[in-house]
Curated annotation (Swiss-Prot):
InterPro entries: Tetraspanin/Peripherin, Tetraspanin_animals, Tetraspanin_CS, Tetraspanin_EC2_sf
Gene it is expressed from: TSPAN4
Protein name as it appears in the record: Tetraspanin-4
Compartment list: Membrane
Pfam families: Tetraspanin
Family from the record: Belongs to the tetraspanin (TM4SF) family.
Transmembrane segments: 14-34, 56-76, 86-106, 202-222
Subunit structure: Forms a complex with integrins.
Listed GO CC annotations: plasma membrane
Protein topology in the membrane: Multi-pass membrane protein
Main location: membrane
Domain of life: Eukaryota
Carbohydrate-modified residues: N152, N161
């Protein structure tokens, strides 16, 4: 009976981790594709220049693949050490995510102020050598969200030391349109515009976060159940 339970949990554990591993492969693939086609796209922070969408996806994908591989191997081999390692790694990730979420909601105002200050600092790197990713990111954000600057279009005046903005701030794009009168530029601040967009999509973000948490809890349950079954089977055989 104990052996039958172990086999059932084993196959469920393997199937779960196979899907987990394939998900990691997908995330890693998207990250590599972004890195190859978009360069350092979405590198907006001047303090963390390596914190690009591509790099985050590559690191996340590789880590998920590693955890999934450990879980698959632990399930197939019925290895207590690997199962416990998988459980501890997944528990660490779960606790880290929970801590980040709690800190984010607890210090929202401070994070807002720091983010705006850091983004304004990053504006001074716009269009400079070696900052293609940051330049592309600002161009895309200002064009797609129809906004200009971090808190105001005048943020760009400090960057250029003149009354001008990047051409991506223009209502109708044309070469050197950023030198024209302010009436031809987007007036909405990018930080608040993107923040409102995120708030409008908060339900989708919440559902995604909840699904992620449920998957992780399911993985922890499978791992600990199988670990206990392996221990029980070893004790029974002994």
């Amino acid at each position: 009976m104990a052996r039958a339970c172990l086999q059932a949990v084993k196959y469920l554990m393997f199937a779960f981790n196979l899907l987990f591993w394939l998900g990691g492969c997908g995330v890693l693939g998207v990250g590599i594709w972004l890195a190859a086609t978009q360069g350092s796209f979405a590198t907006l922070s001047s303090s963390f220049p390596s914190l690009s969408a591509a790099n985050l996806l590559i690191i996340t994908g590789a880590f998920v693949m590693a955890i999934g591989f450990v879980g698959c191997l632990g399930a197939i081999k019925e290895n207590k050490c690997l199962l416990l390692t998988f459980f501890l790694l997944l528990l660490l990730v779960f606790l880290l995510e929970a801590t980040i979420a709690i800190l984010f909601f607890a210090y929202t105002d401070k994070i807002d102020r720091y983010a705006q200050r850091d983004l304004k600092k990053g504006l001074h790197l716009y269009g400079t050598q070696g900052n293609v990713g940051l330049t592309n990111a600002w161009t895309i954000i200002q064009t797609d969200f129809r906004c200009c600057g971090v808190s105001n279009y005048t943020d760009w005046f400090e960057v250029y030391n003149a009354t001008r903005v990047p051409d991506s701030c223009c209502l109708e794009f044309s070469e050197s349109c950023g030198l024209h009168a302010p009436g031809t530029w987007w007036k909405a601040p990018c930080y608040e515009t993107v923040k409102v967009w995120l708030q409008e999509n908060l339900l989708a973000v919440g559902i995604f976060g909840l699904c992620t948490a449920l998957v992780q809890i399911l993985g922890l349950t499978f791992a600990m159940t199988m670990y206990c079954q392996v221990v029980k089977a070893d004790t029974y055989c002994a």
